[in-house]
């Protein structure tokens, strides 16, 4: 569960590395796997200007989709899945990823929440 001021690791190649949640979109007080949040980029990859590889810079505000959480999530078969960190993927207003690659694993719940583009870009879904 990600709330206000939660720190997220950005796992795409948009140029951001850390982001802070400033709003949960349409999900109540907390966001879980597959929910949309508004984030501000706290740390970005080094670069003097915004290039093709670095699409975002520090201080930019973007929408993001939660792809991993530390908090356990119950699956329909009764198992619980949890990850070591909280992670997100930056998206535009149409929920399409800003980056062209996803650098780490994502949760399988993204497929059920209609984020199949993010799930297909990931090297592995768990």
UniProtKB/Swiss-Prot annotation:
Protein keywords: Mitochondrion, Ribonucleoprotein, Ribosomal protein
Superkingdom as given in the UniProt entry: Eukaryota
Biological processes, Gene Ontology terms: mitochondrial translation
GO MF assignments: large ribosomal subunit rRNA binding; structural constituent of ribosome
Location within or outside the cell: Mitochondrion
Coiled-coil stretches: none
GO CC terms: mitochondrial large ribosomal subunit; mitochondrion
SUPFAM superfamilies attached to this UniProt entry: Ribosomal protein L14 (SSF50193)
Oligomer status and interactors: Component of the mitochondrial large ribosomal subunit (mt-LSU). Mature yeast 74S mitochondrial ribosomes consist of a small (37S) and a large (54S) subunit. The 37S small subunit contains a 15S ribosomal RNA (15S mt-rRNA) and at least 32 different proteins. The 54S large subunit contains a 21S rRNA (21S mt-rRNA) and at least 45 different proteins.
PANTHER family found in the cross-reference section: 50S/60S RIBOSOMAL PROTEIN L14/L23 (PTHR11761), LARGE RIBOSOMAL SUBUNIT PROTEIN UL14M (PTHR11761:SF3)
Family the UniProt entry places it in: Belongs to the universal ribosomal protein uL14 family.
Role summary: Component of the mitochondrial ribosome (mitoribosome), a dedicated translation machinery responsible for the synthesis of mitochondrial genome-encoded proteins, including at least some of the essential transmembrane subunits of the mitochondrial respiratory chain. The mitoribosomes are attached to the mitochondrial inner membrane and translation products are cotranslationally integrated into the membrane.
Name assigned to this protein: Large ribosomal subunit protein uL14m
Species of origin: Schizosaccharomyces pombe (strain 972 / ATCC 24843) (Fission yeast)
């Amino acid at each position: 569960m990600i709330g206000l001021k939660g720190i997220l690791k950005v796992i795409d190649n948009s140029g951001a590395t850390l982001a802070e949640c400033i709003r949960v979109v349409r999900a109540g007080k907390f966001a879980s796997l597959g929910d949309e949040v508004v984030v501000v980029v706290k740390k970005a990859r080094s670069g003097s200007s915004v290039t093709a590889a670095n699409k975002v810079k520090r201080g930019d505000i973007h929408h993001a989709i939660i792809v991993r959480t530390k908090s356990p999530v119950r699956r329909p078969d009764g198992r619980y899945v949890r990850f070591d960190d909280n992670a997100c993927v930056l998206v535009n207003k149409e929920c399409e990823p800003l980056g062209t690659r996803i650098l780490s694993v994502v949760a399988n719940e993204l497929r059920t929440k209609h984020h199949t583009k993010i799930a297909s870009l990931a090297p592995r879904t768990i």
